[in-house]
Swiss-Prot record:
Family affiliation: Belongs to the Fmt family.
Keyword DNA-binding: no
Keywords on record: Protein biosynthesis, Transferase
Residue sites binding (6S)-5,6,7,8-tetrahydrofolate per the record: 109-112
Pfam families xrefs: Formyl_trans_C (PF02911), Formyl_trans_N (PF00551)
Recorded catalytic activity of this chain's protein: L-methionyl-tRNA(fMet) + (6R)-10-formyltetrahydrofolate = N-formyl-L-methionyl-tRNA(fMet) + (6S)-5,6,7,8-tetrahydrofolate + H(+)
Gene name linked to the record: fmt
EC number per UniProt: 2.1.2.9
InterPro entries: Fmt, Formyl_trans_C, Formyl_trans_C_sf, Formyl_transf_N, Formyl_transf_N_sf, Formyl_transferase-like_C_sf, Met-tRNA-FMT_C, Met-tRNA-FMT_N
Single GO term (MF): methionyl-tRNA formyltransferase activity
Role this protein plays: Attaches a formyl group to the free amino group of methionyl-tRNA(fMet). The formyl group appears to play a dual role in the initiator identity of N-formylmethionyl-tRNA by promoting its recognition by IF2 and preventing the misappropriation of this tRNA by the elongation apparatus.
GO cellular component, one term: cytosol
Protein name as annotated: Methionyl-tRNA formyltransferase
Length: 301
């Protein structure tokens, strides 16, 4: 079996590794162009490119700005793939590519729920108890293709980084199973009436207000823990928090405990364990409280 793999982040790298370990031949790898990262804007390759360079010496690596470039379809065709496997690639596949071989996407939700760019974060943001991965035959729509298989998993109490790892492993297993069983699978249409969508995450999505429900803020924290984090309009960022018991005026410090402090929200309360003011170093909650000389009854803003 000979495939082309298209993907970019660690989630995709995990899937690619599962395919390689299963003995599936990878003729080519498509990934996003290297991007400037950090304050020094150092040009950095994707996780998938790093993996391919280290483990796939015979695979061609492609980093086109768009798959609509004139030579892309011809280059793919020349590699004679049996399948094109796609996972969090971040680019639209045009019809000229979709027509070359069956294109199978490993989407990190149970479709038709959470079509779009951020399905893992969306599941956590909405307080879902379970999520999963769908293997799907790609078409020209956004995550609208016929489904080939599913894997379900609990996401209760988990954060985005943990779910990316868990779902990457499950997606790798599902990808291998789907390719080897492909001829025996019956594609299943999605019910568009049940479809929900999720968007690309922006930094502004991490903005919270303590007048919100505590559970809503907690779910934002779980979803955006990796990036962009959760922060108040003042720039104060919550680095570690949990749900807590208590009620009071939004932003009021209800009590100070050994390892943190409890603050009231619009409904419910949160225990803050670590935080960071804009432009300053991260602090544990106790150091922050002592430095600001805050006591129960004071407000956080």
């Amino acid at each position: 079996m000979n495939i082309i793999f298209m993907g970019t982040p660690a989630y995709a790298r995990t899937i690619l590794d599962a395919l390689v370990r299963a003995g599936i031949g990878v003729a080519g790898v498509f990934t996003q162009p290297d991007k400037p990262v950090g304050r020094k804007q150092i040009l950095t390759p994707s996780e998938v490119k790093i993996y391919a360079q280290q483990n796939l010496p015979h695979a061609k690596i492609f980093q086109p700005k768009t798959l609509k470039e004139g030579t892309v379809a011809a280059e793919i065709l020349a590699l004679k793939p049996d399948f094109i496997v796609v996972a969090a690639y971040g680019k639209i596949l045009p019809k000229s590519v979709l027509d070359i071989a069956p294109c199978i996407n490993l989407h990190a939700s149970i479709l038709p729920k959470y079509r779009g760019a951020s399905p893992i974060q969306a599941a956590l943001l909405n307080g879902e108890k379970n999520t999963g991965v769908t293997a799907m035959l790609m078409d020209e729509g956004l995550d609208t293709g016929d489904m080939l298989g599913f894997t379900h998993v609990s996401c209760e109490g988990k954060r985005s980084a943990e779910m990316f790892e868990i779902l990457g492993e499950l997606a790798g297993e599902l990808a291998v199973k789907t390719l080897f069983d492909f001829k025996n699978l019956t594609p299943q249409k999605q019910d568009d009436a049940l479809a929900t969508h999720c968007k690309k995450i922006q930094k502004s999505d991490g903005l919270v207000n303590l007048s919100e429900d505590a559970e809503q803020i907690y779910n934002k924290f779980r979803a955006f823990h990796e990036w962009p984090g959760v922060f108040l309009e003042s720039g104060l960022k919550f680095l570690e928090l949990n749900l807590a018991e208590g009620s009071g005026a939004a932003g009021e410090i209800l009590r100070i405990e050994k390892d943190g402090f409890v603050v009231a929200c619009g409904t419910g309360a949160l225990k803050i364990l670590a935080l960071q003011e804009a432009g300053k170093k991260a602090l544990d909650a106790k150091a922050y409280i002592n430095g600001k000389r805050l006591v129960a009854g004071n407000k956080i803003s």
